[in-house]
Amino acid sequence: MRKHGMTDMAIAQFRRLYEVWRNEEASSWIREDEVEPLVSVPSFHDVYETINHDKAVDAFAKTAFLKLNGGLGTSMGLDCAKSLLPVRRHKARQMRFIDIIIGQVLTARTRLGVDLPLTLMNSFRTSKDTMKVLQTNKKFHQEDIPMEIIQHQEPKISAETGMPVSFPANPELEWCPPGHGDLFSTIWESGLLDALEAQGFKYLFISNSDNLGARPSRTLAQHFENTGAPFMIEVAKRTPADRKGGHIVRDKATGRLM
């Protein structure tokens, strides 16, 4: 990892998670009888009815947008970033996730008169293709805030042997980006937080690049500012199709969200 430019923090993170997996530490398990469902979550409509709409743009002006874009679209037949997958046709043009994301940002900037910087958290597998899209878009411009940060990379591990896998014909396949939890150390080490604070931004709206519904919202920005909370998450009801991914529960002992 050090030969690939990874920091001490990245190496320590990987070592810790590897040891947890190898040792099957009990502390890494969440027992069903120790948690309870999350209830009484206010709806977006409820939030909309309670905010001061005159102040909402002020909160939105202090908000930046970060898209998690480190994963490949291999399950969809792509060997590039998932955000490059065409998802709709508009005026005889195929629109990709990334095109719609850029459109959402440009629309918010124009309609509300805010800067709304966009940063992609790319991986070593997605950076080149997605940055080419941003840099060749004649309408998208941004200064002072980086358009991308690069998350860490770590060796792929064989579930059977616990050892790094080997692909002599294509060594790049021996490496992968970590999961979304890598976000926190990446934004810390990249200097993104310092850059945002220097430009007066206080809030960071984060969502996956393939989640077009989770777009920046002045309503949520104002609600977040009103609560004074350090962290807020927007959730949706799970359906039978939502088999992948986790869900939010509350720790019975502490009330902490997990």
Language-model features and meaning:
Residues 1-48:
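Low-complexity, highly charged intrinsically disordered N-terminal segments
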Residues 16-18, 70, 80, 141:
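A broad "ordered helical/assembly scaffold" signature
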Residues 69-75:
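Conserved phosphate/anionic-ligand binding catalytic regions in large, soluble enzymes, centered on
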Residues 40-64, 75-258:
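Domain-scale recognition of functional cores that engage charged ligands
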Residues 5-11, 66, 177-181:
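Low-complexity, intrinsically disordered regions enriched in charged/polar residues
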